[in-house]
């Protein structure tokens, strides 16, 4: 583990040096900002272990260095944000550890006609086991470091004849516990005709991923092409071709997770800023869907509406190898309010979202309902005998746990996200809600994740601000199986921020977390009080 951590730290340093070196050649023509700061954070928690009973309080002291840097020039944009923190735990110094996070991106124009070198680096501390604790952080000392690096080339052209947005890159993901690791090529291309088209219009959308890990590989490909004739009327005919394939050495080879079809449709130009595409599609060959049934003809429909540069709506309905498929993308922005709603369905692999049920032990528990695991511990003087009529009524009870394992399967992911921000003169209100449904295409087991949060921030003086955070998180794992479990997290937080001067600030926060679970051993409460000082330079 230590060797792995050193290796990841070394990669982080090399990536940062490489990005800084690339941008250094352009410093003479750009604007460079460098903002370092020192952070001291003291957090008291009354239940650091996040357990139902025998809670242990702890004072978690964090000291770290934060660096935020931005470089902007005509041909280059570079952003770098990093924080290194060392945490000490008063209840158990064996947990003392250092934590690192990095978020960096580089865009360097190599050629005036749209060739751009791109690179990103992201290092974050995520929950070690999402099923055990979805809200794990540094204070709970139950996180794992996950690093993702990506570098490649973009080619973008936007003129009156045609529009092309394309990219090809190499992506590598490494985690501290080796779960969810992958590396491989990622490519995409989107193209459509320009405004000067008079006879033919087209749309091209293609994405491709080829990932591998531990001798296994997965290829994910999806393509859609529309080619039509421009007429003097508001109705224009077009041909549509669609192809999707997910292959490799993953999952169950007997299941079909591909679809291929062609069709004929019309584009109705409802107005200059909105059009509707409708096509009737015929499957190619005798391919089967994921349930083993022959794929049938279907109708594909898509609508696009853009009344202004600040408002855009796209929606579609179609059919893929698993049945009906939907997509939705809406964004709107004005002086005060920003809204964004996105719904998408995609196939993934090599993630940190695959769980299996393991029995971690057997305990003697009362025959009646068990509220805590402590009730399963028999006193030293107690004697259990099934032949004794005075037996207290104990039984052998298995303790089960959902364990995070390698995601060597394809999964269908349906994600809905809604983000809304209201900016008033002295108050900012943000609302976010997300819903993620994951279907294991091998076992057909479903998991769901729902999260909703409300943040209100109010400026009470020139240097002071108060805030209120309310969040609700719900996870449902192994749905419709004997091991199904639902966890609900309710968190409330109040904070006060004070800027003492231009480089020194003080934050005080009080929070309360309540978790309820179908497995009572995971039900707990936690209260925190934290104070943080940030000194900039």
Protein language model features and the residues they cover:
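Gram-negative and organellar
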Residues: 28-537
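Gram-negative bacterial Sec-dependent N-terminal signal peptides
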Residues: 1-31, 537
């Amino acid at each position: 583990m230590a060797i792995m951590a050193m290796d990841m730290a070394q990669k982080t340093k090399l990536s940062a040096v490489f990005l800084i070196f690339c941008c250094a050649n352009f410093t003479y023509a750009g604007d460079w900002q460098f903002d370092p700061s020192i952070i001291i954070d003291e957090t008291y928690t009354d239940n650091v272990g996040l357990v139902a009973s025998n809670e242990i309080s702890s004072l978690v002291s964090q000291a770290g260095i934060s660096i935020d840097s931005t470089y902007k020039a005509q041909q280059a944009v570079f952003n770098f944000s990093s924080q290194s923190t060392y945490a000490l735990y008063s209840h158990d110094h064996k947990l003392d550890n250092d934590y690192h996070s990095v978020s960096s991106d580089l865009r360097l124009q190599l050629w005036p006609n749209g060739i751009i070198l791109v690179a990103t680096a992201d290092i974050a501390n995520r929950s070690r086991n999402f099923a055990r604790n979805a809200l794990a952080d540094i204070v709970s000392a139950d996180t794992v470091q996950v690093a993702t690096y990506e570098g490649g080339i973009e080619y973008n052209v936007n003129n009156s004849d045609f529009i092309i947005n394309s990219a090809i890159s190499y992506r590598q993901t490494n985690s501290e516990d080796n779960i969810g690791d992958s590396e491989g090529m990622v490519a995409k291309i989107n193209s459509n005709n320009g405004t000067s088209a008079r006879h033919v219009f087209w749309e091209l959308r293609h994405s491709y991923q080829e990932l591998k890990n531990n001798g296994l590989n997965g290829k994910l490909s999806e393509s859609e092409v529309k080619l039509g004739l421009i007429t003097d009327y508001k109705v224009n005919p077009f041909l549509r071709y669609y192809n999707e394939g997910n292959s490799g050495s993953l999952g169950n080879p007997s299941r079909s997770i591909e679809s291929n079809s062609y069709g004929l449709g019309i584009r109705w130009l409802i107005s200059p800023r909105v059009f509707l595409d409708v096509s009737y599609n015929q499957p190619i060959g005798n391919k089967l869907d994921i349930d083993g049934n022959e794929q049938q003809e279907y109708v594909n429909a898509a609508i696009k509406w853009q009344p202004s540069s600040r408002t855009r709506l796209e929606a579609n309905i179609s059919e893929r190898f698993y049945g009906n498929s939907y997509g939705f993308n809406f964004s709107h922005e004005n002086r005060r309010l920003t809204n964004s709603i996105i719904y998408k369905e995609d196939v993934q692999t090599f993630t940190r979202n695959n769980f299996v049920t393991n029995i971690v032990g057997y305990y003697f528990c009362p025959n009646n309902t068990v509220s805590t695991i402590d009730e399963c511990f028999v006193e030293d003087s107690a004697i259990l005998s099934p032949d004794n009529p005075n037996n207290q009524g104990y039984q052998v009870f298995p303790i089960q746990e959902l364990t995070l394992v390698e995601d060597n399967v394809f999964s269908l992911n349906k994600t809905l996200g809604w983000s809304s921000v209201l900016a008033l003169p002295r108050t900012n209100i943000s609302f976010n809600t997300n819903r993620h449904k994951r279907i294991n295409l091998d076992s057909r087991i479903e998991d769901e994740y729902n999260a909703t949060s409300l943040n209100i921030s109010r400026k009470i003086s020139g240097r002071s601000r108060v805030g209120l955070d309310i969040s609700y998180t719900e996870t449902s794992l192994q749905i419709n199986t004997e091991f199904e479990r639902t966890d609900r997290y309710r968190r409330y937080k109040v904070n006060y921020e004070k800027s003492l001067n231009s480089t020194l600030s003080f934050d005080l926060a009080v929070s309360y977390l309540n978790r309820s679970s179908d497995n009572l051993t995971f039900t707990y409460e936690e209260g925190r009080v934290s104070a943080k000082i940030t000194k900039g330079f």
